[in-house]
Amino acid sequence: MAGNSKDSKILAYKDMINQLNKTISTQTELIQSLQKTLEADRLEKENLRQQIEYLTKKLFGTSSEKRKDIAGQLNLFDEAEQEADPTWEQELPDDITVPEHKRKARRTHADLFKNVPSCDEIISLPEEERNCPTCGTQMECIGKEFVRHEFRFTPAKGKVVNIYRETYKCPECAISEEHPDDQTFVKAPVQEPLIPESYASESVVGWAMHQKYQNGLPLNRQEEDWKQLGVPLSRATLANWIIYCAENYLRHVYNYFHRQLRMRKYLMADETRVQVLNEPERNPETDSWMWLFRSGEDGLPPILLYHYTETRAKFHAASFLQGFSGYLETDGYQGYNNLPDIKRCSCWAHVRRYFTDAIPKGKEYDYSLPAVQGVQFCSKLFDCERYSKAKNHTAEQRKQFRLEKEKPILEAFWNWLDQQRPNKGTRLAKAVNYAQNRKDTLMTYLEDGHCSLSNNLSENAIRPFTVGRKNWLFSASPKGAASSAIVYTMVEMAKANDLNTYKYLTYLLSQRPNDKMSDEQLEQLAPWSETAKANCQN
């Protein structure tokens, strides 16, 4: 009996131990699960904190990516760079001017107004004050002295021009007895109106285009301006004029630019959203797209074209670039991938921007942070590019310089990037993934000295559209959006080639471009032509 009792107790203890082990195992699993949950919550909280910090910086902070490195600060990247090329630091300081430290010379009044007409105003003594206060004799003017410069503005004024044309008759034929019925009449030639049955002129339509697409002034505000001048020009009338002239005149110049652009070997592209009302079978809130295609740094006159489409589908880019063969610099949009006969270059400014956005607030100079190190790698590449431009390198010299100086930096960057293990979902993880996913296209620029390190030129070219969009908000119709793309093209082409935008628009309208013009004739309307320069420079 005693033995059975002892065995029973042993079995009971074993069962108790097993139960305790199960409880411990369950508790351990629960603790591990809770730890994972807490860690996930912590990471989510950190990601949300970074997102709030990022959005706050975007909303209230500076948008510049420029940074000043602390003098004498040696960091991880500097060590790798010095090992790659020990002569690097000996070369750069003598040749690169740091913009932040360069003081601009003060501009004089003559510099400010060198392109503005001037005249003299003589202030004379009133007639009744020209008698000598001592003896009363009439005084004589013996000279004049300069007092000051004044800049004066004459507000815009409109006028109605009543156009007549003269008719000429041959007096001999009128009295001829041999041919009494063959009288000769000749009328002076008159250019056809800009718009049939309209009082619009190129100066008025050109001004409306200039105000909206250069100055960002919506048509409703222009309507108010015209009222102040006593002219009842409605926004609908102005819109119709712009659309008519863009489609019937400027489009022919636009198409010529398009043909010229596709003949280049180095292009850049960017795109942005635009809201367009009354698109067939589409909600007004649906995003439409404005594309910007431009020539690269090929040493030829710049060409910039805006292009409106309803969607961002890949075939739009393929259709617009049909016939182009060469290098295309873009942002990260995948729609540019696998375009025929095109080698894609990705933008290093975007890579730098991703790392910049991943830097915590107030930690811009904490060189132990991977995000700061990533920015430094990118900044060194841009330093090299500035150095090359300062040296006026040819395309071949720039290619060799990049292979000698920038390729070691790139190799160090990719090795460093492979060692990064950022937490999933963080801004640093996005920066690392963005660069890793585009490694091949980020290296393409090394192949040709004409290729650019960044897509900043196209981003700068599309910025006037994004600024103007904040004012006019939307296009009322697809036709209006397409016309806007054409006029924006003319405005940006004028600016890129150093022409006065209003003068260039009125010049184009005065020439009445049409589909019967040859490319040789359209070439004379291009902003780089001597004819356009003579008529449209300030």
Predicted segments with their positions:
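Short, flexible loop/hinge motifs at secondary-structure junctions
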Residues: 1-199, 268-269, 402, 525, ...
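Catalytic center-proximal scaffold of phosphoryl-transfer enzymes
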Residues: 2-3, 129-130, 140, 167-169, ...
